[in-house]
Curated annotation (Swiss-Prot):
Lineage: Bacteria, Pseudomonadati, Pseudomonadota, Gammaproteobacteria, Pseudomonadales
EC number assigned by the record: 4.3.2.10
Pfam families linked to this entry: His_biosynth
Claim: Lyase is one of the keywords in the record: yes
Keyword tRNA processing assigned: no
The family this protein is said to belong to: Belongs to the HisA/HisF family.
Entry annotation: catalytic residues: 12, 131
Protein name (Swiss-Prot/TrEMBL): Imidazole glycerol phosphate synthase subunit HisF
NCBIfam families linked to this entry: hisF
Organism the protein comes from: Pseudomonas putida (strain ATCC 47054 / DSM 6125 / CFBP 8728 / NCIMB 11950 / KT2440)
Length: 256
C-alpha cells in the first residue's frame, strides 16, 4: 500500500509575523502565525512547518513563545527551524511543543551535530533543511550547491552528496528548498527534487516555487518527493488545503 503523501503549509516567520518573499527577498506580511496555523489545522493540513527566517541571519533564537502558543492550539505535527545550533536549542523547541526540529546552517558548520541530535532525540524528530541553487551551466551535468544563512552564503557543497551524508548521520527527513524557484510560483525544481529523492531512503519534502495545484502533484509524481510544502498559494487565499488534496487525489496520489 502506497504511503499517503503529505501537504505541508509553511510559515516563514520574521519578528513574530508570517511573511512571504521571492527568492528569499522582497518580503510581504501574511499575518499572525498562530491564527494562520490554526486555520490550516482546521482545513486538514497534514503538518505545519514554522521557519524563523530571521534567526540564523541575526543570530537570534527561535521564538519559543510563538511555538508554545502554536502548539497549544494546533494538533497536527509541527516542525520548527531557524537558528537551531545546539542540543539545548532542540530540547527547548521540543519542550515548547515542536514535534520535529529543522537544522540548516548549523549542519553545514558542524555535520556531527546532526548525528548527535539524532542519537539524543531520535531520527524521527530531526529534519535537515537544504537550500539548493543550480550552479551547472547549459550542457553540463546538472549540479546543485548548498547555500546557508537564508540563502545568502555559498558553501561549495554538492546538494545530492550532502543530502546522502545527512541521511547517513541520522537525519529522519530532508526539507529541500530550491532557491532558484522560491516564491517564483512556476513550480518546483523537479531536477534537484528527483535527484535527492531517488538517492535517499528517507522522506524528502519539496519546497520552493508552488504557484498552482498541478505543481504540488508534479512534486510527487515527477519529483518523487514524499511531501510537498507551500506558502503563498495558501496564505493569500488562492487555494485551500482541501482543494489541494482533492486535486492530488484526482491525479492518483494517495493523500490522508
Amino acid at each position: 500500500m502506497a504511503l499517503a503523501k503529505r501537504i505541508i503549509p509553511c510559515l516563514d516567520v520574521d519578528n513574530g509575523r508570517v511573511v512571504k518573499g521571492v527568492k528569499f527577498e522582497n518580503i510581504r506580511d501574511a499575518g499572525d502565525p498562530v491564527e494562520i496555523a490554526r486555520r490550516y489545522d482546521e482545513q486538514g493540513a497534514d503538518e505545519i512547518t514554522f521557519l524563523d527566517i530571521t534567526a540564523s541571519v541575526d543570530g537570534r533564537d527561535t521564538t519559543l513563545h510563538t511555538v508554545e502558543r502554536m502548539a497549544s492550539q494546533v494538533f497536527i505535527p509541527l516542525t520548527v527551524g531557524g537558528g537551531v545550533r545546539t542540543v539545548q536549542d532542540i530540547r527547548n523547541l521540543l519542550n515548547a511543543g515542536a514535534d520535529k526540529v529543522s537544522i540548516n546552517t548549523a549542519a553545514v558548520f558542524n555535520p556531527e551535530f546532526v548525528g548527535e541530535a539524532a542519537d539524543r532525540f531520535g531520527s524521527q524528530c530531526i529534519v535537515v533543511a537544504i537550500d539548493a541553487k543550480k550552479v551547472s551551466g547549459p550542457g553540463e551535468a546538472p549540479r546543485w550547491e548548498i547555500f546557508t544563512h537564508g540563502g545568502r552564503k555559498p558553501t561549495g557543497l554538492d546538494a545530492v552528496e550532502w543530502a546522502k551524508k545527512m541521511e547517513g548521520l541520522g537525519a529522519g527527513e530532508i526539507l529541500l528548498t530550491s532557491m532558484d524557484q522560491d516564491g517564483m510560483k512556476n513550480g518546483f525544481d523537479l531536477g534537484v527534487t528527483r535527484a535527492i529523492s531517488d538517492a535517499l531512503g528517507i522522506p524528502v519534502i519539496a519546497s520552493g516555487g508552488v504557484g498552482n495545484l498541478q505543481h504540488l502533484a508534479d512534486g510527487i509524481l515527477e519529483g518523487h518527493a514524499s511531501a510537498v510544502l507551500a506558502a503563498s498559494i495558501f496564505h493569500f487565499g488562492e487555494y485551500t488545503v482541501p482543494e489541494a488534496k482533492a486535486y492530488m487525489a484526482s491525479r492518483g496520489i494517495v493523500v490522508r
